[in-house]
Regions:
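Conserved HGGG/HGGXW glycine-rich cap/lid loop of the alpha/beta-hydrolase fold
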Residues: 1-47, 61
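Gly/Ala-rich beta-loop-alpha elbow adjacent to hydrolase catalytic centers
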Residues: 60-64, 68
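Flexible "cap/lid" loop of the alpha/beta hydrolase fold
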Residues: 73-118
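Conserved alpha/beta-hydrolase catalytic His-Asp/Glu region
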Residues: 92-95, 111-169
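Conserved alpha/beta-hydrolase "acid-adjacent" motif
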Residues: 134, 183-189
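Short beta-strand/loop motif that positions the catalytic acidic residue
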Residues: 170, 176-178, 182
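Catalytic histidine neighborhood in serine/cysteine hydrolases
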Residues: 187, 191-210
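Catalytic histidine-centered segment of alpha/beta-hydrolase-like enzymes
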Residues: 208-221
């Protein structure tokens, strides 16, 4: 079985995928590659490829999905299958890029916690019994990574390229997945992504927002298990 490389989202680490790591690591090797080193998406993807196995399954959520698309663009022959979760294939709009600037100013002034609490975390999750626990975990991950990572990741996202042409070229088993209540990367955007990929499975996770790996972990893990057993008929 090929190993899996997971790519976490902005201000997240391996804990974003903890339920999936627990379930899937029983059967295969798993690596969580950092998305916090590098000034641009291209540089982050290059670092991933340097440390990744020769061939691997690739799964990214949010910013991790953006990096995953760049990894595939650079080395399609090394990616055996790809899962894109709660992510965005298009370049940043001028409006969204401008909206990051006040956040950057606040974080430079030592207000990372406030930015995460007031501006980012409220957009992340669907209503649910574990919402407060997951939000607390998001805060812990962000504070552990720190302000410099926030600044680098913000700039990298502002400068990212459009990956629609990359999606059209994907020739391996692809899973496109998002939370039903994701306000940052909507189900409609993911349906559009799935339509660009010649052979893909598109799933919307009920009862989840931007972080379904934590909000509905069993559903996501089950879908990933199915994705990992798809034959390499497209290779």
């Amino acid at each position: 079985m090929e190993p899996i490389v997971f790519l976490p989202g902005m201000m997240c680490d391996a804990r974003l995928f903890a339920p999936q790591l627990d379930a899937l690591s029983r059967e295969r090797a798993i690596m969580v590659a950092p998305t916090c080193v590098g000034e641009r998406i291209e540089e982050i993807a290059s670092n991933v490829l340097t440390s990744a196995p020769a061939k691997f399954a690739l799964a990214g959520l949010s910013m991790g999905g953006i990096v995953a698309m760049e990894v595939y663009r650079r080395a399609p022959d090394r990616v055996t299958r790809i899962a894109l979760m709660d992510t965005n294939p298009v370049s940043e709009t001028p409006e969204r890029a401008a909206a990051r600037e006040p956040q950057i100013v606040k974080v430079k002034a030592g207000q990372l916690r406030e930015v995460m609490r007031d501006e980012m975390k409220p957009q992340y999750l669907a209503p649910g019994p574990y919402r407060s626990e997951i939000l607390q975990l998001c805060m812990e991950m962000a504070e552990d990574l720190g302000p410099e990572v926030f600044l680098r990741q913000s700039r990298a996202l502002q400068r990212r390229r459009d990956q629609q042409s990359t999606l059209r070229k994907i020739k391996c088993p692809a899973l496109v997945l998002c939370g039903e209540h994701d306000k940052l990367c909507t189900p409609e955007r993911h349906q559009f992504m799935a339509e660009l990929i010649p052979y893909s499975v598109f799933k919307v996770i009920g009862g989840a927002g931007h972080l379904p790996t934590l909000e509905q972990p069993k559903l996501v893990t089950d879908l990933m298990q199915e994705w990992l057993t798809q034959p390499f008929v497209l290779q």
